[in-house]
Amino acid sequence: MTLDISKYPTLALAETPDELRLLPKETLPTLCDELRTYLLNSVSQSSGHLASGLGTVELTVALHYVYNTPFDQLIWDVGHQAYPHKILTGRREQMPTIRQKGGLHPFPWREESEYDTLSVGHSSTSISAALGMAICAEKEGQNRKVVSVIGDGAITAGMAFEAMNHAGDVHSDMLVILNDNEMSISENVGALNNHLARVLSGNLYTSIREGGKKVLSGVPPIKELVRRTEEHLKGMVVPGTLFEELGFNYIGPIDGHDVVELVKTLKNMRELKGPQFLHIMTKKGKGYEPAEKDPIGYHGVPKFDPAHTSLPKSSGGKPSFSNIFGDFLCDMAAQDPKLMAITPAMREGSGMVRFSKEYPEQYFDVAIAEQHAVTLATGMAIGGYNPIVAIYSTFLQRGYDQLIHDVAIMNLPVMFAIDRAGLVGADGQTHQGAFDLSYMRCIPNMVIMAPSDENECRQMLYTGHKHQGPSAVRYPRGNGMGTPIESEFTALEIGKGRLVRQGEKVAILSFGTFLANALEAAEALNATVADMRFVKPLDEALIRQLANEHDVLITIEENAIAGGAGAGVIEFMMQEKIMKPVLNLGLPDKFIHQGTQEELHEELGLDAKGIEQAIRHYLAK
């Protein structure tokens, strides 16, 4: 449903940045108010990311007003906050389609718009990319400006600091804007720093910092304190000390909701040479009281009525796999005081809220630091504890070296609870959990499990927790199938699958939650169906039996076919000279766009009807 733009008269004049730059500066506050209201009304009708964008309205307007985009290059880290950017860059009328199949991409996307300089989705990539672009811009000599906008969560990641460290050394012209909406860096900041930011006086910063050190050092009672905690004190007086030490000229913090002051500051900073760092303070959810009070709850929202003060509650029913994991953690921790649960900033999404409250001493949120999360678990395992790393499939990619080098080589008992395995739906290419079976299956010592339903998931989590080596349980986004969940824990036999349906000629080997689809297809084909359970080690005896008793084997998984579970079946059969035709069904060799999970399964032929058709087509060859 398209909104009536006549209700937003100033916004109607700014469909593109070129039009925006024609507006008088005094109209910008009105534009921001209309843009914020438009964003709220649009997302409430379509669903999507809300609170982050509400907090970056003034910054977005100011950036496009000051910088000559798309010639000047603007990069949004992660991209949750980029909805206002999409609205102002010619995509306003398409906003109702965002995150939907065939609609606007959920994040900035190069194929979608020339204003989207970098395709994003994962955090903390913007500064590295901006530096690369800035280096090239200097070589071209066209006075192109490069700006990176990064949040206070994303900037905690190691990659961001690696990039800033290099940028300070290379000294290219670029601007990093820290969108700080949590007061995480500047709790002790007062009026002095706001004044210094407005006058943009780096020399004054330096004199105050150095002069303050001299004054404090001359006072005997605190002379020793200053000597021992000099860096801490500098950080209290000047929050940008860290960034200045990395080679940036630090300005801020300033009010990120004063669009006129932002424009003045950005115009001044646009002409500065070398790496610049602007620290702005914003409020996530700005302008919509429920989102201001609950920015986490309103980070990503379903369709809702903005007139109501709360989001619609889910209808209940079948539990999500994330909640099954959360319940497992609580139940297991009641028995095992050495259980340690680690998450890289995914407490809510991974179903760990209850556990974090009931067992706070066994819960560790390491922020956006996947590499650290994995090796932290290594240390805990060496210390005699039982760590569980709760992580999305797409984010485990970032800790791959640590998985191999720090866990698997030492054969340590670390379990990975891999959420969002398979197609996640609306977040698109950057978030699909398409590769974990492929990138884990080649690692020695790994035990990899793929449950077919919620009870099997619970028992596999228990199996992995008790296993004396590295293990992984991968499960999809969304709710289970309604299978009754046994409260009692039962360890599964490692590497053993089970026959679910006996048929003739065709045997379907199902890895994971496509089992229900496989069974439905098997009814039409009178095929045998096996729930393989383990991707590694494979149930080789069961594969041999099925190959001996059937003419054709079909494997199905919600993972890339290349290198996945089905590839493992073929490798085993070729090694054993078992010459039977095998059809691998799974995700094709391409990045899968956004859409609902159901839409994507149907499009890729992975629903029951598609599986049946694929098998019939294969048999007809």
Curated annotation (Swiss-Prot):
Top-level taxon: Bacteria
Known EC number: 2.2.1.7
Entries under InterPro entries matching the protein: Dxylulose-5-P_synthase (IPR005477), THDP-binding (IPR029061), Transketo_C/PFOR_II (IPR009014), Transketolase-like_Pyr-bd (IPR005475), Transketolase_BS (IPR020826), Transketolase_C (IPR033248), Transketolase_CS (IPR049557)
Catalytic activity of the protein: D-glyceraldehyde 3-phosphate + pyruvate + H(+) = 1-deoxy-D-xylulose 5-phosphate + CO2
Purpose of the protein: Catalyzes the acyloin condensation reaction between C atoms 2 and 3 of pyruvate and glyceraldehyde 3-phosphate to yield 1-deoxy-D-xylulose-5-phosphate (DXP).
Record family assignment: Belongs to the transketolase family. DXPS subfamily.
Annotated protein name in UniProt: 1-deoxy-D-xylulose-5-phosphate synthase
Organism the protein comes from: Vibrio vulnificus (strain YJ016)
Lineage per the UniProt record: Bacteria, Pseudomonadati, Pseudomonadota, Gammaproteobacteria, Vibrionales
Gene that encodes the chain: dxs
